[in-house]
Every structure is written in structure tokens, then in C-alpha cells.
Amino acid sequence: IEGPPKYEYFSFIGDNEDGYASEYMTIKANALTPIPKDWSLQEAATLPCAGLTAWRAIMEEGNLQPNETILVQGSGGVSIFALQLAKAHGANVIATTSSEVKAEKLKSLGADEVVNYKEHPQWGKEVLRLTANEGVDHVVEVAGGESFNESIRCAKLGGHISIIGILDGNTSEIL
């Protein structure tokens, strides 16, 4: 894609397309996520929205590779699916959360490291420490707002940030 962003690049099913729950419709091919080659239609139909969002972000768009490091924010649906998909793909996972109870749950689901953003408001620095100042290959950014600065801070040069949500707001001053 060349030139400035265009609104049409951000119109996908469920985002800005009317009729996404229709039985039949004509849409652009890039609005769909391909079914993995070895999956049946029945298996693909079991993917919930959060799982499909995580899959598209880290596998289709992010091209996650084994042994890469990914940061997932929080313990919501998209982040939990991203954590589990990344672990199944052989990646290292760092998660952020706000409590020790949630941290333990994230670890039980496979997180290699968990950073409490209440204890580390500039959690990107803690992620850098955990990665020997290399940063992460991928960030699943669901918070938006000021969190985006920390995502940029901890992303490896040339890393991939999937902006999925704006739970903390849609504006941020990039530092």
C-alpha cells in the first residue's frame, strides 16, 4: 500500500460493512481470513470472533514464527486466544495484566512472563528488561490510548504491532 491511509483499507466484515451476518454477500477478498489449509469447514466454523481476530493479527498479518517473542495485553478474549495460538506455534509469550490472580491465570495458559502494569506503569521498560533490551517481535495492542507508547517502546525494530482495540481511548501523544 502506497501513499496516505485510505478509509477503504479499514473496512472489513464486522467493522464497517453492512450485512456481515447475511447468508450471501459480495465482498473484497481481503475482508476474509483464509481457512488454514489442513482445516475442514466444520473446524473453521468453530472459531469465535476473538479467536479469529487473534489468528488474523498474529498469523495472517503478523506472520508469527516459532521462537519469536510476542506481547499480549491483558486477559480478554483476543489476548487469551493470541497467547494460546502463539504458544501452540512455538513462540515465547509475555503478557501484561493488572493483578496477581490474573497473572497466575495467564501463566497457567502458557505465558512465559507476566508484567503487572499497575506495578510497572511504564511496562514497556520492563518488557525490554525481560528481552535483554531486544524488544518483542509482535505486540497485540488492545488498549490504545497511552498504552500505545509502551507498545512502541517494547517492540523490536522492524517488529509488528497489531492494533486491535482502543479500550483506553483513541488518542495518544506519541513520545
For each of these PLM feature ranges, what is it?
Residues L167-L175:
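Rossmann-fold NAD(P)-binding glycine/threonine-rich loop
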